[in-house]
UniProtKB/Swiss-Prot annotation:
Belongs to the plant acyltransferase family. This is Acetyltransferase MATC1. It is a peripheral membrane protein. The keyword Oxidoreductase does not apply. Keywords: Acyltransferase, Cell membrane, Membrane, Transferase.
Amino acid sequence: MKSNVDTVLDGYTSVPVGVLDSTLANTDILTRITLVFPSSLSLSALQESWYALVRSWPILAARVRATPSTPSGLSYLIPTPATLESLETRSRNSASKPLEKHIVLLDQSSRSFSDYHPIVAKAVHSNLDRNNISIGGAPLVEHEKATICSNACTSWKQLIKQDQAFVTAQATKFADATTVTISFSHILGDAFTIKHIFQGWQTALNGQAVQELQDVGKDPFIKYLPKDTNDKKHKKNKKSEPAPDLPLQWFRYGLARKIKLISLLLWEVKVKKPEKTLGQYYIYLPQAKVDELMAQARSDLEQLRSSSATSATERDLNVSTFNVLFAWLLQNIHASTAIKPSKTSSVICIINAKTRPPAGHVPADYPRHQLWGGALGAPLRPLSAAEYVTLPLGQLALHIRESITEQVDPENIRKSVVMALKHSMWKKPSGELLFFSQNPNTYWCGCTEWRSAKFHTIDFSAAATPHHDAIQPTAAPAASVNPVAITTNMETPMTKRNRWALLGEANNGIWFTGGLTANEASNKNGFGRYIFVE
């Protein structure tokens, strides 16, 4: 049961969490984002620069607590300078528990990265095929947790009660690589947020002062928060007020459809494809293959242009690299999964109000820092499972682009924000079930896109061991040390099935990750066509 009294902690300053950040889609997910560097980095340099960053941005050491009096019902309890100093001392103490540490260092320099994560190890050693697509499994769960997030929270219930930072870091050094991970609750924000933190870490690593965050506590979407339905005046007028329109491709379920959807999900999770049969896989597309897919898509659309009676001026047939990559992924997912061809497939992607503001937005609404999120679910127009497999790549990419174009209309973005705030606030969810398919009996999947965050540009050369351990004022600067792979994992009370991430560019190619059964990963009509790394 949620408390009616705001939590107060001595030595901490309370700052409300933004309303959109406090929706269930964010409170339910704890994420880890790892950059894999093909070098032996100095763990001490990474540690000292992380502490320097936290001192500049103390919100990274904040606790998260319930504060019913605030619009979101949640607040960051940010340590004062004196408290932060005490927390850092505790964190540095080797006798402290992992959950008490802002950053954990793990020296595995006696091991090769190949023992831990074979497909990414091939990127570390520049051994991935440059002309063909590769696929491989994630590390064993227990090994991964020890390697990247041993000090991270594992559930929302734990996070809002424990004396623990909601953002933590871990650096693990192997003989041939170093992993650097940021673990966080999704209330912190989105991929742009984590890129911003890595950039701040890079700045501190370079020995430069990290600028203080501006506008901490400014809520970018507070003006879209619907009136409090507990307000007596609002209740009195409620019947005369029109219900807000739902955004495109979202549907409100009544009791019958709600029961049907829940029963189908239980059958899927417990009987048809139990969670224990799913594994996480990573897929690498070399740049040569990306270029090939783009050429194929352009050829498909040129054929459509020449065969269509519709004038090219009436329909824009251009597609982006993201459109094509997403189309390729969806073709393979549907070809690899046992779905009845005639079954409707409902696909959701992520759009971001940071770059596509809602109607009514003015620039001054947004804080001057990046530690907040703007991610929103955007369903594509429905297709059958067969269409996802058989449509030419270019036409499927066009379908994706046209669906997203509708979704990013400012008025539709406004509706998406309002829907999230009206129905899925952690403080008080509406209890209504909204779903991105009109029919409960549908195949569904989703994909988030981190490519635009450009994690591959992070440069940790200042921590390169030879350079760091033998710094001379006249020494030439070390060559750039950029990640060759991006990996991720998450903790959620919901199923991880059918969730994918376009992780972005690294090692002159594109990385994806998602959940598959072993049979799906080896299906010769889909992912089984590619090089399997084990």
